[in-house]
A protein has these predicted regions:
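Short amphipathic alpha-helix segments
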Residues: 283-297, 312-327, 426-438
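N-terminal glycine-rich flavin-associated loop
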Residues: 8, 25, 31-64, 68, ...
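Short, conserved charged micro-motifs
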Residues: 48-51, 282-285, 356-364, 428
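Mobile "lid/hinge" segments at catalytic clefts and subdomain interfaces of large enzymes
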Residues: 148-235, 239-308, 344-346
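Conserved small/polar residues in nucleotide/adenosyl-binding loops
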Residues: 455-462
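N-terminal flexible segment immediately upstream of the FAD-binding catalytic core
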Residues: 1-57, 61-66, 73-103, 155, ...
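Terminal amphipathic helices with adjacent charged low-complexity linkers/tails
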Residues: 295-407
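Flexible, glycine/charged-enriched surface loops at secondary-structure junctions
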Residues: 2, 15-20, 63-67, 127-130, ...
Length: 462
């Protein structure tokens, strides 16, 4: 290990750390997995990463244990940022916002999404595929995991917003990857180098198996698993887009050093209908009814999330400040009183955006009218401005972090990653998964996008 540290130190400008404390810290991410690395490298720039990749390629035969795992914020819930050999943490140095406009923005992978959004809001624009961990995650991880979140109902996942990537492939060289027309693709394939070989092999794969690959595409509302081969080559448009393989590949196909995202106008005049659902028997019907109104966002969380939020309410001072927390507490008093009529099984948040505040208000009112058939199973709250609805959006976005850091004598283990559940079977699915959770005496919360329930996180005894 000492030899590995010395050799890498001689290659890179950034720091190289093999201390026990650092290796222990990087043996974890937000998942339940644990792998202790040999060395952690903090690359200064793309050149540092290229040198490490070439070092591993040159020495892999003599030392098969060598491997590279890229890491930014370390919030991956499926173990994608832990490894036993070399960790490359890009969050320390490669975290800059490079350029922007109202249509696109370019940044380095170690930049936190919260900082990226602050920068894009200067252009009155956002990149809308942020996950619930928007205040914790980095944009490199969003690309690596093909992130999706509360805005994905309207806009889709990260794969739809990646315009250009700078990627280091296994030969240790950096390349620009972007959509190509057929003439540009043919030119790439004709290159007598490693890049040309990649394009030739991938094109042969997707062209020779075109019908099978297209038929294999899952017919679900959200899918971030595996390599999305069906998105790479489109015979009808003649576009070949290798970014579609890299997005969601968790660093297994190459290491991303620069990202250009397509942006959309920042939403204005948001309003939310909050639905406190006492029973879940008609949840599938309710979801389909709501979707007819084409909301911008449709989220939900269970009663355990709600009660945990009330129980750990002081935690919110970190994100809101003491004054903000006090204001939030006052706003929650009416909702706390509603709970005396019974704790809801689910809290649903239906958000609309419109050019004017009045249009948003009318959309919220109309949805509430159209859901009157469910009035015996639900309570409704019109939060016709973003400020009014903020209290519930904070609960939704912070639900995992509450379990992760605030439940005493327990450690958080996300034992399931994202799951797709058809709305029609949710009334059957939710009680059964809760039965399993209760059987093993776990404290767990369930939250997600309605129509595709996302994750189940549990806090288990130490």
């Amino acid at each position: 290990m000492e030899n590995l540290e010395t050799q890498i130190k001689n290659l890179v400008k950034g720091e190289v750390d093999t201390s026990e404390a650092t290796r222990e810290f990087y043996s974890h991410d937000a998942s339940m997995f644990e792998l202790k690395p040999d060395v952690v490298v903090f690359p200064k720039d793309s050149e540092d990463i290229q040198k490490v990749v070439r070092y591993v390629a040159d020495n892999k035969k003599q030392n098969p244990h060598l491997s590279i795992v890229a890491r930014s914020a370390g919030t991956c819930m499926s173990g994608g940022t832990v490894g036993e050999s070399i960790i490359l943490d890009v969050s320390k140095h490669m975290n800059k916002f490079l350029s922007g406009s109202k249509d696109e923005a370019t940044a380095e992978p170690g930049m936190y999404y919260r900082d990226f959004e602050k920068a894009t809001l200067e252009y009155d624009a956002i990149m809308p595929s942020y996950p619930a961990s928007r205040d914790l995650c980095a944009i490199g991880g969003m690309v690596a995991n093909n992130a999706g979140g509360e805005k994905s109902l309207e806009f889709g996942k990260t794969e739809k917003f990646v315009k250009v990537l700078r990627v280091i492939f296994a030969d240790g060289k950096e390349y620009e990857v972007k959509p190509l027309n057929k003439a540009e693709l043919d030119k790439k394939i004709a290159q007598n180098d490693y890049e040309g070989l990649i394009y030739k092999k991938v094109f042969d794969l997707v062209e020779n198996n075109y019908d099978q690959i297209k038929a294999a595409k899952p017919h679900v509302s959200k899918d971030s698993m595996g390599y999305h081969l069906w998105n790479i080559w489109d015979r009808q448009t003649g576009i070949f887009d290798l970014t579609q393989a890299i997005v969601g590949s968790q660093g297994t196909l190459g290491l991303v050093t620069k990202i250009t995202f397509r942006l959309v106008p920042a939403p204005k005049n948001s309003g939310t209908l909050v639905i406190f659902l006492r029973k879940t028997e008609d949840l599938g019907m309710l979801i389909n009814k709501v979707l007819e109104h084409k909301p911008a966002t449709f989220e939900g969380f269970d009663n355990y999330t709600l009660m945990l939020s009330f129980k750990l309410f002081p935690y919110f001072h970190k994100s809101l400040g003491w004054l903000g927390m006090a204001k939030l507490g006052i706003k929650l008093i009416p909702d706390a009183l509603k709970l005396f009529r019974g704790i809801p099984k689910m809290v649903l948040l239906v958000e609309f955006n419109s050019p004017t505040a009045e249009e948003t208000k009318q959309k919220v009112i109309q949805l509430r009218k159209d859901l009157q058939e469910f009035k015996h199973e639900a309570l409704f709250e019109n939060d016709e401005t973003e400020a009014k609805a903020k209290k519930f959006w904070i609960m939704r976005r912070e639900s995992f972090q509450l379990l992760r850091s605030k439940v005493k004598d327990k450690h958080t283990a996300p034992f399931m990653d994202d799951m797709i559940v058809p709305p029609a079977v949710l009334p059957e699915f939710l009680p059964e998964i809760r039965e399993v959770i209760n059987k093993y005496k776990l404290l767990a919360t369930i939250a997600g996008h309605m129509g595709c329930l996302l994750y189940t996180s549990d806090a288990a005894d130490e």
